[in-house]
Amino acid sequence: MLWKSFSSVWNHYNVPRNETGFDFPGKDHVLNIAHRGASGRFPENTMTAFAAAIEAGAQMCELDVQRTRDGAVVVIHDDTVDRTTDGRGAVGAMTLDEIKRLDAGIRFGDDFKGERIPTLEEVLALTDGRCGLNIEIKSDGVEREFCHLICQMIVSHGALATAMVSSFDWNVLAVVRDLEPRIRIGLLASRSPLRLLNAAFEMRAESINPKVDIVTEELCVAAHKRNLNVYTWTVDEPAQMRRLIAFGVDGIMTNYPERLRELMG
């Protein structure tokens, strides 16, 4: 019944397929998006993981950003440093100097001891001309000033054509769009595909970024009719990658970008 509702809502539209999406060198049908870098083999959200992702064939790296007490934008998934570093405490309660003293590799193994939490500026510099970025803004207590900082960095690094901002909090994306309409946005969701399509279309988003569990061929068709790309997460098994490619997804976020590269030939 859900897909009958899709048809009734969308069948009177006839929007051409997106011809202005990301088009990186080597992109062949499906965008290879490294989830927190090549995080299956390297410490997530580190410079090593991003460099390895590029080497493994990723055309885009997905990452997460948080803000330090003194206003720096750092690349880390959690709002605390407990899980991924040798420290403890909230990211927002620490200065950048304190964050930089933490070891972001030791929990992944002794071979990665000494890895540091990078700033967004550092990752933008590393990936410049090498791959795109999907910058996820977490949903808790995000301020307009934080969004403004991220927009400024994207513009100042000349990354408007290769970067996008995504979030589960679509209000955050509305703020980003208000601050800098040229920045592409992607709406994250783990449920309610019809609501996701509606919101993304109304916001003129680059993409919907649905959890793999809710991706179907019908969803991809409906998204494409709305001029929306479908970037799904997080997919590590080649068999599942093949199925999603057959459905018509435009991008796959994976912890193992080398697997998607091999599958794509």
State what each model feature region is.
Residues 1-265:
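Phosphate-group recognition and catalysis centered on beta-loop-alpha active-site segments
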